[in-house]
C-alpha cells in the first residue's frame, strides 16, 4: 500500500504523473485498536500495488534515449543482502508476518483496509482488486488470529493460499556506509509493515545516496558526506521506532505486546546513543544535490 505522499514522490522523481493510474484505491481505514476496542473508521488515501507490478511499470518508462557509457564503478551500492564484512544487522524484534491470499466476501468494502489488534498479534487486510486481497497475520498462528477476529469475519469468503513468511520487525545495517560503499533500500533499513512507508523511504534513501556519491565525485570530503548519510538514515530509523512504540503501546496488555515494546525500547536506546555521538549537521539535501550548510 502506497500513501498519497509517496505516490507524489514517485511521480515527481520519475516524471510520470499517471504512474499509479488504474490501481485499487483505499479511501478508508477501519481500525480496531487496542485489543477489545470497537472499530473506528478513518479517512485514508492510498493505492494497493504489488512490488513486481510497480517494478514493471517503472521498467516500461522511457529511458530518455541514447546509449549509456559503462565504466568501472568507483562505488558499491549495497541494496540487498549480503552486507559487507565490515557491517552487520541490528534488529529490534522477532515477530514474523504471514502473507495470506484471500477472496473477499460479496459485501466486503473494496475501498477500505482493516487493522485489528488481538491479545497476541495483529491482522491487516488489504483489498487489491474487486474480489481479492491480502491478509497479513503477525504474532500468533494465523488461523488462530483469524478465528478470534471481531472485525474481519464478514469481509472474507475464503483463504486461497498462505504465502511466504517474512520478518516484520525493524532492522538496520550498521555501519550503513564506509569507504567507497553505502547501503541503501532494503540493504540499509527494514521497517515494521504496520508503521512504515518502506517504498517511500527507499526512494528518499536512493536520492540521498546518489547525491552523496555525486558530491564526493565533485571533490567533497568523503568522511563528512558519509557521516551525513549515516546520520540522516539513522535519524529516520529512530523516528520509525518512535512511531512503532506508539502503536505497540496501544495494541494490548498481554505478554506478547510487552515483549514487542521491550524490543522497541532497546532499539530507541541504541539509536539515541549513536545519535548522541554523531557530528553536527554540515550538509543538507536541496533537490537532488547535497550542499554544504553556510
Show the residue positions of the predicted features.
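A structure-centric signal for secondary-structure junctions around beta-strands
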Residues: 26, 132, 178-179
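N-terminal glycine-rich phosphate-binding loop and ensuing alpha1 helix
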Residues: 1-9
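Tryptophan-centric aromatic hotspots in well-structured domains and transmembrane helices
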Residues: 33, 47, 75, 122-123, ...
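Predominantly flavin-linked oxidoreductase catalytic cores and closely associated redox partners
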Residues: 59-161, 165-173, 189
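C-terminal helical "tail/cap" subdomain of flavin- and related membrane-associated enzymes
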Residues: 214-294
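Conserved N-terminal helical subregion
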Residues: 8-101
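FAD/FMN-dependent oxidoreductases across multiple families
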Residues: 141-227
